[in-house]
Amino acid sequence: MKEGIHPNYREVVFQDMSCDFSFITRSTIQTKDTIVKDGKEYPLAKIEVSSESHPFYTGTQKIMDTAGRVEKFRQKFGSKLGKVAK
C-alpha cells in the first residue's frame, strides 16, 4: 500500500444518543469529540439509531396500513390532481 493516501483506520466509540448505548469498532470516521471508555480515550461518533433503538431489532415495529394511507391521500388531493390518463 502507498503511504499517506489512506485514511486513519482506528478504534472509535459509536454512541446511540436515543438510548445511551455505545460500542467500540474500527472506523475511518473523523470526529472532534472524545470519550474515555475502559480507561482509554477514544474518538466519539454520535449516532441517532443503532440496533438497540431501531424498531426492527427491538421488536416494537409497527406495520403501516399503506392502502389506507393511499386512500387518505386520494381523498385529500384527488380532486386537485384531476383525471389520470390510463
From Swiss-Prot:
Family designation: Belongs to the bacterial ribosomal protein bL31 family. Type B subfamily.
GO CC terms, sorted: ribonucleoprotein complex; ribosome
BP terms from Gene Ontology: translation
Gene designation: rpmE2
GO molecular function, one term: structural constituent of ribosome
Subunit structure: Part of the 50S ribosomal subunit.
Identification of the protein by name: Large ribosomal subunit protein bL31B
Originating organism: Cupriavidus pinatubonensis (strain JMP 134 / LMG 1197) (Cupriavidus necator (strain JMP 134))
This protein's record includes keyword Ribosomal protein: yes
Record keywords: Ribonucleoprotein, Ribosomal protein
UniProt cross-references to NCBIfam families, sorted A to Z: L31, PRK00019.1, PRK01678.1
Gene3D superfamilies for this protein: Ribosomal protein L31
SUPFAM superfamilies: L28p-like
Keyword presence, Transcription regulation: no
